[in-house]
Amino acid sequence: RKKLNWNYEPFQIPKKMLNEWRKIGVKAHEKSKKFKNKNHSSINLTKNLKLLNTSIKKIKNDYFKNLKPLATRKTSEMFLNVASKLPNLIGGSADLAGSNNTKTKNHKIIKPGDFSGNYIHYGVREHAMCGVMNGIALHSNLIPYGGTFLIFSDYCKPSIRLAAMMKQRVIYIFTHDSIGLGEDGPTHQPIEQLTSLRSIPNLYVFRPADLIETFECWDIAIKSKDTPSVIALTRQGINPVRRKISYKNKSERGGYEILRTKDKIDITIISSGSETSLACEICHKLATENIYSKVISMPCQELFDQQNKIYKNKILSETELVVSIEASETHYWKKYTGASGLNFGVNDFGKSAPYKKIYDHFGLNTDTIVQKIKEKL
């Protein structure tokens, strides 16, 4: 300070410097105002969502006429086929558009000299992609989404954490969400990634079980102004679990009852994503042996944790035995099952094999789980 002849107290700004700084502020005020007006111009999202819902109702109606197994990455693409018409939805992928199903026939590529499109080819750069999406969300009213494999979410973590911290509406499409991706083996099969993402404050981690839940999770993500969202999707086809048409968004509560075999039950089974159809099979198999249960589909733990105590008790406290099933690391489910519950999942690195064989290897099949539940009872 002495060498620089700086004789001011800490945090004291010399008047001459302060005046010069304020001149810059005045000079830039009008430019800042014009920039803000241009980039935050009001696009009527509510009106556009109403138009979108009309198209979605038609897809749902057609879907229930012909229920069949579909990968949730495919059902997400079906949503994007109509949602890509939203004027402020900007898509992209880290060179995995064909695998993530993030690009549809309605997308136009953003490229040098032509920024009128709504889809960005980011290249093999997950970290850069998520940083760019943060910037898009921060400076405009645009809603960015980008895709990669769930295993590569680790490359995205710093930017995801910042999006959650800054309360930005950014949507991450993470496909190939479990050992269900099959032969690519343990290097590409996510195990601990869902737990890691769920531990980030102010981040919704969705893992939908079928087309209906996928559409519901997308709907919530688009409407969540202050919270970024992960949507984890399957590579493999899975059986639909919602078999009756409903226009109410049941996923908004994070977890809800999807199946019950009797009024008085012995077991609560909680599951997410591709394992929800497995949970339903187990529920029916137990009923043939006079053991009655209910299945709770939980596409979003964070939303469930926000529910009131009465609702959570209704879901979790009806039975002494609570069981969780998810093809992922299991520890994060113990807050629901308790120490006396059962947690079925994958607590080791995966294997390279057809996905059904890998599920059998880790005991994620109807017969194995039914037997272990009976032993517990």
Predicted regions and their residues:
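Charge-dense, low-complexity intrinsically disordered segments
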Residues: K15, N19, N66-L70, D360
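Intrinsically disordered, low-complexity N-terminal regions enriched in serine/proline/glycine
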Residues: N7, E20, K34, N39, ...
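Thiamine diphosphate
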Residues: R1-Q12, K16, E30-A232, G237, K314-I315, T366, ...
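Terminal amphipathic helices with adjacent charged low-complexity linkers/tails
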Residues: R1-N53
